[in-house]
Structure formats: C-alpha cells, structure tokens
C-alpha cells in the first residue's frame, strides 16, 4: 500500500455532483464490490457526523437575503415606469406584459443566485443551506420559494399572471398572493398524481414494445453506423455520447489509426478523440444492428451499471423502456405560455469594453422597435462601429438583422449593452392574437395610418398599416328610441340653467322612415388637487304643456277628500261607504283609466265557496284595470258587467292539510255533523259531506260541503242529471219544494249507491240602481269629458274562492274613470287636490284638468271631410311635446360634425365639468416658451377703443380695466369657436380688434408690418355676447411695452411662442409650461387667455398588422373589444413541454410545424441528392437516407425534452425504442398481391429476405409507428392480447391461424415458461452446462502424469472435447435459421 504522504488529498465540499464523480471513478478503478464497501463507510461517517452535529431544521433557519428589499423595490420602480409609458401611449399591452414578466423573472433569478452566497458568507452551517446545497433534500428552486420569493405564476389557461408573488413562505402570503399561488401550483398533489400515472402508463407502453429485445449475439456483422460530430456539441455532452459505445469504422488521424473497428470507447479514448477534434466518428448503434428480433453485444455497447460490455442474455429492451419512462415523473405535465420570458431568437448581447463615444454610419440602419417597445436601429448589412475614448479605439462589426440600442455619437459606459445579435437558426414561433378592451366609454378616433376602408364588405374591421395611436374620447352615449327631437340652440350658443335643450316630437303621421335622436353627453371631470371628480348632470323631464292649447278644469264639488292612514277617500252624503282614490304619484290619468273605487259591503263574503254566474254578462277589458288580489298578492283582471242580472255564491268549508291521511279522523264521502273533530286541532263548523283531494306532495285539500243527502228512487235518470241551480218554488224529484235557491250536486262513490247533495246557494243581484251615474253628472255644460261608473266582477264563473287569514272577500267593485271621445285631442288628464276655505272651514276637493290641442288651422273649403282633415292636418301641423332634456349646468352647446345615419349628437361644454389647466402660476425671470417657426408675421389694426393716441410730448393714458397684467387680463373672454391652430404665450398675445381706422403709427405698441396676416380668423365671445376678432402679432415695440407694463422688463426681449391646436390630442404629462406638467391625456376643446380646457381621453398604441373593431367616430362602451394585436410567441420550448411532448414524439403524432431547420436541411439534401440523380437506385437510397435521418432526428427531439428538464438518459435506450418504431414497413398495391395483402404491416428485415428469395420484389414503403400501435403489431399475439383490445386481437389471430413461437419474455411469463433472458437464455444455459462438464471431467483425472500431460496439452484437449463460444453461436444460428424456415413454410 502506498505511503500516506504520497496520497492525493481533496479538500473540497462533496455535493451531489462530486459524489457522482467519485462513485464513477471508484467503479472504474476498483469495481462494484470494492466501491460498495467504500460507500458504506461514507454513509456511516455521514450519519455519525450528523448525529454529533445535532442538525435540525427550524423555522428560524429560513433566512431571507438582505438584497431582496432593494431588488423588489427596483423591480417595482421599473414596473411603474412601464405603466407610465403605457399610459403615455408609448407601449402597447403586449410590450408592457413582456417588460413586466422579464423584469420579475430576472429579479427572481438574481435573488436565487444570491441565496447560496449569502448563506455561505453569513451562516455556512445553516441546515437549509447544507440540505439544499449538498443535494440531500430539496432543490434550489424549492429553497428559493422558502427564503426568496415565490415569483410569477400561471393561470389555469397557462398564461403568466402579471402580478408576481413578492413574498416567500417564511414571510407568509397575503390573500391575493395565496389565490394566485393556488393558481400557479404546478407541482401540487393533483399534478403529481396525474404525472405519476401518465409516466407509469408511458413505461408500460415502452416496455410492451421492446420486451423481447435481448442480447443474444456478440457481433451481428453490420458495416453501418451512425455519424456523430464534435462541431455543435458541448464537451460534456459529446463525451457522454461517446463513452460506452463501440466504433463502427477505423478512426484515422494523419493516416494513423488511433481507434480500430469494434473497439469500445472509454473515458481516456473519448477525451483523446475530443482533444484531437475528430470531425466524424461512426458508432455502432441499435438502429443499424442487423439482428431481427434481438440485438448484438457490440451494437449495444457498455452496460451502464458495470462499465463493461453488456453480458449475454441481458434484457436490454426492458431496461431501455424503464429508463425512459421512469424519469417522466420528473418532467412538467402542463403547458405554459410564458409570453416572452425567454428571448429565443437573440443569440448574444454586444457590450462595450470601456467608456467612450460610439460612432456608426446612419445610412445603413433604419428605426424599429424592440420586443419591449424601446426605440432601436435595425442593421441592413454588416455595420461597423467605432468606440472612441481618450486613449483607446475599438472597432466592432455588427451582423445584419441585429438590433442597435444606442444613438450615433452617444456616450456609452463600460459593459453597457449596445446591440443584440440574432441567432442564425431562428426558433419556431406562432402568431397569437391579444385582445385589447376599452376601459373608457366614449368616442373612437384614429389617424391616417389606419385603413379607413373596412377589410370586408359590411364589416367594421379596419387594418392598421403602421404603428399609431387609437384614441377614446370620454363621453356617455345617450340614445333616444323615439321620434326626431328638435335642438333649440345652435353651435357655440351659451346657455344658462335650467333651460330646455331638446324636445321630442310625436307626429301623427303615416311616415315609415323616421330618424332617431342620439344624444351624446360627454362626461368631463374637474381636475383639482384633491382629485375630486364631478360628473355633468342632465335630467329628463316629462312636460305636459302644449303650445297654443286650452285647458279644461272641473271640480268634484259634492265630494270631500278625507285622509286615513296615508290613504285618500271621497265622501258623499248619498254614499254609504267612501270612495277609495287610486291615483299615480305623478297625478296623470289616461283615457278610460280608473281613479276611484267603491267597495259595497253587501257584496262581501266571509266564507269560502264557488262563484256561479246567473243571467249577467261580463267582458274582460284591458290590462289597465288589473287589481291586486288581497289573498294571493297577485294581479288579476277585472270583468266588466255589460248586462245586469244575478250571480250565485255556494258556500263551503275548505282546509289545506300538510299532514298525512293517517292524521285525519274522518273519511272521504262521509257526512259529518257540526263540531266533528277533523284533525287534532280542526273542528267542522257546519254539517256536510267530506271531500278529500290530493294537491301535491303530502298536501291534501279537505272540503266540507254543507247540505242534505238524498237518495232518489228513479235510478235510471241519474246519468242524465247534472249539477244545476234550482230556483225557489220548484219541486225536487216530485217530492218536496225548496223555498230558496238550491244547488244540486251529484255524488257517485265507487262502492256505494249514487246520491245527490242538496246545497244552499246565495243569490246576488245587480240592477241599474247600483250604477250611480246621476251622482257624478257634473259636466252637463261640457260634453267633451265625462266620468263613467262601471261595475266590475272580480272572479270568473265556476271559480273557487278561498278565505285566507279570515279576511272578507269583495265580489263586486264600482269604479270611476275619466272618459273623453277620440275626436277631442286629449292625451292625458292631471288630477290634483284643491283646498278651499269656506266659513272658517277647510274643504279639499278633487280637481281634474285636461288639455286640448288648439293649433289646428281650419281650411276655408267646407267640402273636406273629417277623415281628410285628420290625414292631412295631422301629418303637417301636429306636434306634441313629450320629453325635454334639461341642463343643470352653465355651459356652451357644441354640435358634433360627424353625423351617422341622420343621428344628432351634441356636447355641453361646462367650465365646472372640464379640466381647467392654467398656463402659468407666477412671473419669474426664467420663463422659457418654445417657438413655432410656422407662425406668420401679423399686423394689428387697432388695439382698443379706449387706447388713446397722443402726441410725442404727451403720455399714454391706459385704463387699468383693459390692461391689468396677469390672470385679470381679458377676464371676460369666452370660448373659442374654431378648429385651427392658435398661438398663445405666457403673457397675453390676444388682442380685441374693433373695425376703426388707425390714427397714427408713431407711438403704437405695434411696429410697422411687412406682410399681411396669413393666420385664420379667430373669434372670442364675451359675456355681453359681443363677437371680437382676434389677430396675432409677433413684432412688438418693447420699449413702449415696458413703459406700459413694468413687469414686462423681467422677460427677455426675444419672446418665443408655443403653438396649441384647438382639437389637438395631447398625451399625459405633456409640457406646456415648466410650472405644471401633471396634465391628463385628452383633447383640447377650448382655449382661453389664461387656461385651456381638456376633454379627457385615453390613447392605445397599436402596431402594424393589428385590427380595429369599430368605425371611426363610433361610440365605444367600457369593456368592448377595441383592438386585436398580433404578436409572435415561441413555440418549440414554450407551448409543449415535458411529458406531453415525449408522448407526442413516441406516439408519432403529427405536429403543426416542421420539426427541423429548413435552411440547413435543404443544403444537406442538395449535397446528398446530387449523387442519386440519374441512378436507378436513387429513390431507394434516398428513402433509406431519409428514414435514417428521421430516426436520428426523433432520438434528438426526445433527448432535448429530457435535457431541458435536467434529466440525463443514454441515447442507446432511446435508439432501441425508435428502432422498434421504424422496424415495420407497409406493403403497396403495386406488384405482387399473392404473398402479402396491400396495406399489411410486416417487418423490414423479413421483407428484405423475401425480396431476395422471390423473383419479383414486394413493393413497400417505410412507416413510423407509435409505441401503442407498434405494441399491437408484433410477432406474438399473446403479447398483443395482454396489452390492449384483447377480444379483437384474439379473434383476428384465430381467423388468420397465427402461431406464437414464444420468443419474447412476456408470452413466456403468461404461459409459465422459462423466460428467454438472463439465466434462461440458450447461450447462458449452454455455457453453464459446459462448465459443469469441465468440472466433472477434471475431477476424474487425478494421476500426476495425467495432470502433467493435461497441462501440456490442455488447449488441444479442451478444444477437442468441449465446444467453444463460436461453436455455440454456430449451433444456435443453425437452430434459429431452421425455425425461420419452419415459419416461412407455415
């Protein structure tokens, strides 16, 4: 053993990776047995040290990194900045979401990276740190959620929620964060269970495909292999690909063979091949193995658990299936739309090496936007950059299609990102639609960058040509569905309050095409420091006044009004009971509408019963006379009595029982006496017959029908009798006579003799005396209006009336209603109370007022009939004022010029309801205002009437009223009424001009002009309704102006002007004055001398290619779809991840996009296909190459999914699965059909042998089968039936007469035979038998001489007596070929 001094001592932390490397080196040098003892000692040592250290995990050990606070604060500031830019209209919704997601993603990742260094510095023995860093329990991501931040979550649809969880589990989550956390719990209990079950089923399918593949041969003799190169692979990945594989072709370096064929590759040879940078290495692979139903030792390579070539008889198929399926539980299950977390097509960032100024040629770049909405330059071709500092010059070359993030001649700092270079191979993307919804109600406007013509006919979809803004101007849309209304005021009229704005016309005409009125009432807000928002108030008033009309008023003089408990009654001496008044709150009556009701007590009943009509006649009238039933609280119609007569009421007792029939003491169709106990708490009040009827679930209706039972003798007449009313004095059954009205009801029990029940009936008569119209004959002089008295019956014939809560029921009501004939043009009547004092007594009367239209003009011709008069005059002269819109605020009418379909829209501009923005607060020396170069030189004709022109020696007399400086100047000016440019400055440059001539120019404030004024005309309206013309001047005599206004000397002599356009759309916080910039976004609708008024608006940025869902000038409601943005999203790594992706590949399901890079693919195809053109075998070879390339691509795609999740799987396992997926071919219809049926699936190796044996080849084409379908198309029908579709597989095998040769593992297990793998393999059995024979033979030879001879000739004797491995394989080969011949003969 070596001395301890010479041993190498590794002083480093042994984490999970280091332990893996140590175990690998131990196995490579000492083997598994020795390594096991070493690992047992390490385990014991670890437990001992953990016990001595008393390591435990407590909640106090969860320490948050101190950098978290400022990291989150920095991210929040960046998020607020993005929100501001979005409000300014600089970013659209997708760019804002990308910025937000990437900011919080970077913050979370940086905090995760800071976690371990923080633990290492502050508390290296922290249990959480040791647990996660060593890999004993928990990953870095899990610990990050405990002590860092939870981060971004996804919603149930897979979209990233833009509200990150800033807290961790140690700090505790808020309610909102907890709900979001529940949404984004990707590895919850449900997901884990589903993922485990999916991975288990995937493993079962994989094992089902390859369960029969066993190593049964050393070398299959193939000359093919797969090519691996060292160009695009990383060193570690390429080394893992090489170790454990066997070389298929000799590898030469400078004509010297460094690795022969059939040599396995170890770690030393792999490192040597990587160091020498060997371009192409051909490796033997299960994909190219020539064996049919098994695999050879050299094509498989090493056993990963032993580090040597695989042993004979090893079931490598099952190992491969379990190796791929078991890590499925570690893969993600769901699909996530990250929305731009990964940059994707950006390969690298270019950073500056030092501080300096950057220079480049601007002709080779053009402006564009980054994916975050930032301005950038796109390179046409290769762009040369020069970075200059004082002592250094650095040159850079930026490739085309790259983004340049800096300006020319800009100062850049060291390590600053100045460019983003795109990757050569662009990742797969998909176009996604993002719907933007309006969060403001108002009117839509856009610029000329939108195609105003709709994309389709009769559509409101408009395409955005270039990046532009869509504006929603705030407002509330008020639409009138009635007829055309008249707007009384014109544009720019001032209105006071309260005043009518509109009136609605009701035209008596037959015109069909009537337009509608749309009132567009804008919501403006008063923006103050305390941010109080006041909405404008507009009210709708119902007016009953009609122009040029006559009123008809009359009073019910004989009736006094009395009030009892909030009810009003009409009392009269001749009435036994008062009239109850029924009037609406607004006091309006329509024609034939009831206004008073009389309930006669003689028509009230106290008992339940049935109503029967006699000889009266009733009529169901309109719904205006519906009344509320006091019993059921439901509205029901009244029945007007049109002919006097009588009706009858038949009393009975009715009880509703909610108990079962067992609790009822009496039986059905039995006669009981008064006072009989019905239930435990109900007794009957009268004698009568009991009738019980079921009404619902456990509900019964019990009736007691009062009367006398009579059994008639003449039974033959019973069937002809019906239930009828018998008048008094008539004999019943020729035996007795009734004195009162009687009701005969026949009862026919099922088991007893029929009988008749003689029931009493109460008669009610209605005569003309009930109609008290004489009492209301009040309008004898005026025949136009009358009050009608109508009797109403409240129940219909044969209706059952039930008493509830012992309340009496009214049967008849007498109602009063107002009636006028249609020839009089009355529409409504107003009812009011009139209080009159007579002899110190106050009496209240009822007054009814009617309004008649009198604006008809009669024509002179007497021959015109009434019908013609109505038709002609009603169409042209009649208008009734129905609705008015009244304004409660003072303001100005402004009519919108955009008219659609004849609809009217107008705005009321009120100074108290708008944003009033003052231009400046105070005067200082540093007033700076921007200039407008387009302002033309103007001339002033006269300053004012009060401005007096004096001689040189005299002073100028100026009135303070007209020329007070500051905010008092031109205080009386009103709103402007134009839509063109207007120029203002901090001081007043507005002047009122009256049309008088200029007397002298010597001492005028304005110098002489050179050009005439080219500005448009402006008008101001003052309070005296005087219109003044406005002209703008720029050249001013400063000396005279300073003399007039001393404060003017504070300013510079050069005054700059700033242009503000009336109607201009301004973004939030636009700069007008340096004293205030916190303005909301909106449209300037009015400009005064000291302030301007802004209509609030919201801009939405939209990029080219997006679509707008409404027309220009239309009204948008809050929440309506406004814009559809089109943006690109990564598809390959984002949309389908983990287990679904693996399952999609293994099941050979088609995908939407191409799975390889087309650009490089076509170049490779062009190079490979040149040698096949004109070759008879060209199609065959190209098909073979494409199939081989498809196999390699499928292996790479599956491997990428596992590598992206951090799972390492050897390629040979995946290659075994793919080999079985591509081992079948499908026969074609061309050629021979007597051997195989067209469309039949057969093995590829079997097809090749058949084509060599037959004269005419069988045409076929390769096919890629999924693992499920491949499992159902094997040589063993027992294996197929045990997997899926047992009945179908067995029936199909029976019809075909299939024979199972039991070559696989599964069919032997099912039948209880020896498994042909491991010790059950034929090769292994023969070798074991051979060893036993050797031992027996050697034991018999014990003589010394014989042993010496045997030692000398041991090789020859052994060779001659016992078979070698080659002999065993030859014998097996002959037996296998014999089995194949038997299969073929069958």
Swiss-Prot record:
Q: Which residues bind Zn(2+)?
A: 220, 289, 296, 299
| UniProt keyword Flavoprotein present | no
Q: Which UniProt keywords apply?
A: Chloroplast, DNA-directed RNA polymerase, Metal-binding, Nucleotidyltransferase, Plastid, Transcription, Transferase, Zinc
The protein in question is named DNA-directed RNA polymerase subunit beta''
Query: Per its UniProt entry, what is the enzyme's top EC class, as one word?
Result: transferase
* CDD domains with a match to the protein in the record: RNAP_beta'_C
Source species: Marchantia polymorpha
- Subunit composition? In plastids the minimal PEP RNA polymerase catalytic core is composed of four subunits: alpha, beta, beta', and beta''. When a (nuclear-encoded) sigma factor is associated with the core the holoenzyme is formed, which can initiate transcription.
Q: How is the cofactor bound?
A: Binds 1 Zn(2+) ion per subunit.
